């Protein structure tokens, strides 16, 4: 037993020494540039938090006046999308960098509305669905705090703000979002120094800082039967989990 423990200890020591062994650095001066550009591609999962109002009084325009309806709205899954863009990065010092990354986020959110007041033949709430397409033009401003480089990798964390313009939205949708939004970004990543470029995989979490619901949308609806679904929500906040690859 003692021989096995000694062998395992020696093996662990050898592996640790090998992991900490200095190697030839690829692109050793790449982080000394005052400013540089790059491109980015990635994928993301997006969700929409919806605050339901509960019972509501609506006029369906059928001559029966105001009637009470209860409709719940939910995005019951995380929907995938993709991201493309460019970046410019300013070196502040050996630890901090400031990055500006104009990009476009494309995706679709699957929303489900359940009318609890009007039941179907099976006694279940009737449902309506909406595929809320999203196309955002963004320009993220991130502060990067990086650890010292070791061999050909360098971990880091980020914190930033990402203002976005929403280019999507239809007049006949149940839910419509505002044309602008602002996201808080928190994430982590690691620089990998390859022979010809630096690869930076990054995972970040994004949360909307404002209510992104277009509350004036209900005034433009032509079909009054849609009102109960549109008015079932009084607040929405978007959130994303993004995996991005930067090539610099």
Segments (PLM) and residue ranges:
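Gram-negative (and chloroplast) outer-membrane scaffold detector with strong preference
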Residues: 22, 26-35, 43-47, 87-169, ...
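Active-site/pore-lining binding-face segments in mid-to-C-terminal subdomains
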Residues: 176-184, 189-193, 198-199, 206
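Residues that define the transmembrane beta-barrel architecture of outer-membrane proteins
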Residues: 33-37, 78-82, 133-139, 153, ...
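Bacterial Sec-dependent N-terminal signal peptides
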Residues: 1-24, 245-248
């Amino acid at each position: 037993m003692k021989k096995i423990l000694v062998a395992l200890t020696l093996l662990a020591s050898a592996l640790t020494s090998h992991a900490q062994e200095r190697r030839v650095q690829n692109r050793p001066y790449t982080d000394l540039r005052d400013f540089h550009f790059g491109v980015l591609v990635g994928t993301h999962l997006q969700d929409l938090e919806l605050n339901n109002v509960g019972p509501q009084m609506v006029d369906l325009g059928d001559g029966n006046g105001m009637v009470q309806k209860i409709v719940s709205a939910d995005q019951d899954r995380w929907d995938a999308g993709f991201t493309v863009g460019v970046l410019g990065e300013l070196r502040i010092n050996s630890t901090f960098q400031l990055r500006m990354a104009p990009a476009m986020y494309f995706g679709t959110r699957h929303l489900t509305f359940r009318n609890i007041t009007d039941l179907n033949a099976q006694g279940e709430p009737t449902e309506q669905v909406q595929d809320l397409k999203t196309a955002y033009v963004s320009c993220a401003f991130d502060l990067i705090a990086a650890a010292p480089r070791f061999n050909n990798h360098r971990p880091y964390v980020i914190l930033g703000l990402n203002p976005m313009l929403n280019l999507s939205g239809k007049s006949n949708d149940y839910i419509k979002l505002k044309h602008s939004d602002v996201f808080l970004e928190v994430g982590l990543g690691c620089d990998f120094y390859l022979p010809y470029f630096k690869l930076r995989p990054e995972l970040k979490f994004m949360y909307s800082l404002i209510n992104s619901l277009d509350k004036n949308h209900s005034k433009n609806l032509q079909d009054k039967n849609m009102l109960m679904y549109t008015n079932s929500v009084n607040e929405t906040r978007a959130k994303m989990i993004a995996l991005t690859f930067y090539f610099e």
